[in-house]
Amino acid sequence: MTDTQQPELTEDGRQRRTIKSFVMRAGRMTEGQQRGLDKGWPLFGLELEDGLRDFDQVFGRSAPRTFEIGFGMGHSTLEMAAAAPEQDFIGVEVHKPGVGALLNGVMAHNLSNVRVYSCDALEVLQGCVADASLDRVLLFFPDPWHKSRHHKRRIVQPAFAELVRRKLKIGGVLHMATDWENYAEHMLEVMNAAPGYRNLAADGTYVPRPEERPVTKFERRGERLGHGVWDLKFQRQE
């Protein structure tokens, strides 16, 4: 899934300067994706400029709330939202074709529990999401930036962990997944050292793939080729 922009943050999670953890890609819009933007955005799109939001008011109810960083083409978001109509989902993605694809799917499935931002997810967390208001934060298959000189671009850093911790409710969970073992090790190192979290893995490493995380076509292909996927779950304790 597509990563987000990585601002360099201070220890308390405030933005210092911008480091990109994604590369903007030009891409054609399909008819369905364009329809999603044209017709779906006025119904389900949210703007960063609107600032702090009361999501109970946005969704018209109080329900368990999931925030997904970088939903790519939106397949997993759509599957999760359709399977859990009692929950609300806020998805953030910078690439317009993916935004259009998700919105088109939301309309096709007649879903009312999805809202979408098309901008930097960390700016949304900082400026639009109240502290202690999220039940889950999802980060599935972010850009691994596998070259050592690019590791600073990885979104999972100590300040990211602190920002997410502030936005999660006590007992809320950060769920990450990656198919790069080195990035999984990096995630584990950062999160095990992050204050205020508990690793939900029994052995303090990785959890088995949770049933609620959809399996993507890329993951299935990787499994056929013998590639691994690592899931991490960390729960806010304080």
UniProtKB/Swiss-Prot annotation:
The superkingdom of the source organism is Bacteria
Family that this chain belongs to: Belongs to the class I-like SAM-binding methyltransferase superfamily. TrmB family.
GO MF, one example: tRNA (guanine(46)-N7)-methyltransferase activity
Task: For this UniProt record, give its keywords in alphabetical order, as a comma-separated list.
Answer: Methyltransferase, S-adenosyl-L-methionine, Transferase, tRNA processing
Residues the record lists as binding substrate: 147, 179, 216-219
**Cross-referenced InterPro entries:** SAM-dependent_MTases_sf, tRNA_(Gua-N-7)_MeTrfase_Trmb, tRNA_methyltr_TrmB_bact
Q: Which PROSITE patterns match?
A: SAM_MT_TRMB
Protein name (record): tRNA (guanine-N(7)-)-methyltransferase
A GO CC term?
A: tRNA methyltransferase complex
- The intrachain disulfides are none
Reactions catalysed: guanosine(46) in tRNA + S-adenosyl-L-methionine = N(7)-methylguanosine(46) in tRNA + S-adenosyl-L-homocysteine
Role played: Catalyzes the formation of N(7)-methylguanine at position 46 (m7G46) in tRNA.
NCBIfam families under this entry? Answer: tRNA (guanosine(46)-N7)-methyltransferase TrmB (TIGR00091)
Binding-site list for S-adenosyl-L-methionine: 68, 93, 120, 143
The enzyme class is transferase
Pathway in which this enzyme or protein is active: tRNA modification; N(7)-methylguanine-tRNA biosynthesis
Return the EC number: 2.1.1.33
Q: Which residues constitute the catalytic centre?
A: 143
